[in-house]
């Protein structure tokens, strides 16, 4: 809404559209603008408020923020990056993945050719670099030249992240009228759900290791809420777009598992595709 947008317009960035990670309620910066996802969500938010209100200023903020994101793509954290340069340089799936989603949200504000180029580059990264045909799955980190890395970070698998990305890709497939892209995203989503599902206790693991080794993250086996929300969205969207029986079955499985762990007085059952 305008009240939230005005607060962020005044206090959310440093004047050059570098967006702080956190603020006090009075608007004073708490955390430096190190996180590129503060920028991506700001761009999406201001783009949508601009569409809703017709504000040229909000549209400009979305556009300027998008430009900053593109400038920072090669080194998103900039001066706040903790990694020592040149030792084990990896690139992350997270940025091209979120740009696939952001592209559709800010489309009205962006030059058509720039938007097309950005979408093309991000689709290539997500579906040809981070997606590994030999695994049938998406990896979280690769070397700067796109190779697998036999390191803790390089072997990290994040099923929820991959499933979230696949419904972004399905949306792009609709926008581009690309049936093959939609079908590929559905195939990857199904592979990922099968891979990430805990066969003993149910639910999708937070992190896994590409080679089956123990993970370093203490929370690797937790069943996080967002993982199951994104997975459910991916499956219902896959079913909607393709009629896939497997997507329908996975939607039901994920939905029932998730609601079995949520304690509310009147649980809601979605029977629309049962």
Regions found by a protein language model. Name each.
Residues 134, 144, 152, 158, ...:
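Short glycine/serine/threonine-biased micro-segments
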Residues 21-28, 81-87, 141-147, 204-213:
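Short linear capping/connector segments at secondary-structure termini
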Residues 68-97, 102, 129-148:
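Short, flexible helix-coil linker/hinge segments at the edges of structured domains or between repeats
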Residues 262-274:
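Single conserved hydrophobic/aromatic residue that forms the stacking wall/gate
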């Amino acid at each position: 809404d305008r009240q939230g947008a005005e607060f962020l317009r005044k206090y959310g960035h440093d004047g050059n559209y570098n967006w702080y990670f956190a603020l006090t309620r009075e608007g004073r910066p708490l955390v430096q603008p190190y996180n590129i996802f503060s920028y991506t969500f700001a761009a999406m938010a201001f783009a949508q408020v601009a569409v809703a209100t017709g504000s040229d200023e909000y549209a400009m903020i979305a556009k300027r923020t998008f430009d900053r994101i593109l400038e920072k793509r090669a080194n998103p954290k900039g001066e706040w990056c903790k990694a020592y340069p040149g030792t084990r340089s990896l690139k992350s799936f997270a940025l091209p993945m979120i740009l696939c989603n952001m592209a559709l949200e800010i489309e009205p504000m962006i030059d058509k050719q720039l938007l097309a180029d950005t979408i093309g580059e991000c689709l290539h990264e997500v579906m040809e670099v981070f997606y590994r045909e030999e695994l049938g799955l998406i990896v979280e980190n690769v070397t700067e030249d796109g190779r697998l890395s036999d390191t803790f970070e390089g072997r990290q698998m994040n099923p929820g992240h991959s499933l979230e990305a696949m419904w972004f890709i399905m949306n792009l497939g609709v926008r581009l009228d690309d049936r093959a892209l939609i079908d590929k995203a559905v195939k990857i989503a199904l592979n990922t759900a099968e891979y990430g599902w805990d066969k003993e206790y149910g639910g999708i693991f937070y992190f896994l290791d590409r080679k089956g080794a123990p993970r370093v993250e203490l929370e690797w086996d937790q069943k996080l809420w967002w993982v199951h929300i994104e997975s459910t969205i991916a499956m219902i969207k896959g079913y909607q777009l393709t009629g896939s029986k497997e997507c329908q079955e996975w939607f039901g499985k994920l939905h029932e598992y998730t609601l079995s762990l949520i304690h509310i007085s009147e649980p809601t059952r979605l029977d629309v595709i049962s």
